């Protein structure tokens, strides 16, 4: 019985320490600053797109309510994709962008605007790369023309 006591004590000590070892790294959502930070980045990014002459054909003629809905969908999508608590309820990207005639040139310009936004908010390189990698997976569903 005396031999088991140190073994049990050691096992209990290790078991108590396990939660510290099991902790995961913070999600991209948390590292970006959470919901408010993602919303601010979205506002800046959509502002850049809406004032960029290359994208005027996509934003012209939309009501303020339509733009608000687009904004919320983008916030929810980024929030969910980065590990946050949001749920994206919008349409699939392919459906949302079908028929818009988005080109490679449009894609490249939008990525440039996104990088400028991330730089404005001083997003660290690691997180910026993660966001850009995540966004790049959407390209196949958004770009319709070379």
Language model feature labels by segment:
Residues 1-10:
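Bacterial N-terminal signal peptides that target proteins for export
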Residues 22-146:
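Core of compact, soluble alpha-helical bundle domains
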Residues 9-19:
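Bacterial N-terminal signal peptides
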Residues 3, 19-22:
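Low-complexity, Gly/Pro
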């Amino acid at each position: 019985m005396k031999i088991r006591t140190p073994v049990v004590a050691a096992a209990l000590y290790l078991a108590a320490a396990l939660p510290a070892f099991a902790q995961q790294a913070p999600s991209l959502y948390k590292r970006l600053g959470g919901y408010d930070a993602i919303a601010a980045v979205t506002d800046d990014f959509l502002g850049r797109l809406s004032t960029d002459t290359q994208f005027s054909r996509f934003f012209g003629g939309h009501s303020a309510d339509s733009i608000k809905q687009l904004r919320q969908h983008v916030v929810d999508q980024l929030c969910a994709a980065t590990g946050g608590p949001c749920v994206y309820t919008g349409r699939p990207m392919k459906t949302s962008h079908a028929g818009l005639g988005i080109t490679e040139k449009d894609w490249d310009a939008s990525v440039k605007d996104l990088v400028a936004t991330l730089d404005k908010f001083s997003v660290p390189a690691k997180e910026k790369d993660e966001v850009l990698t995540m966004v790049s997976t959407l390209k196949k569903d958004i770009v319709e023309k070379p």
